[in-house]
């Protein structure tokens, strides 16, 4: 037979999770900025090419909605998925910037092309 105290703990855990999620969702909908706090997090995270590869515009609202209500999951996700190499992609803007080296005008101070 299933112990009675496990029912109580499971009920209160479920109630707490549902209360937090519903209350946060209500406040976000009431204020009209449901993705506001998560967009601030994505602003820095999407500078890395790993996040550019992984997150698309169709997936981002799901992550925004999920991690807005579960902030510690966002930190775990950010810790495990952050790439230590920001310039890892072939066509990243950082690599395009230095693809052809420095421009002629910055190589020579007199402005002559050699």
From Swiss-Prot:
GO biological process: ascospore formation
Record has Transmembrane as a keyword: yes
GO cellular component: membrane
Record region (Disordered): 90-114
Subcellular location: Membrane
Transmembrane recorded as keyword: yes
Topology class, membrane: Single-pass membrane protein
Keywords, comma-separated and alphabetical: Membrane, Transmembrane, Transmembrane helix
Transmembrane region(s): 7-27
Primary localization class, coarse: membrane
The protein's name: Putative uncharacterized protein YPL205C
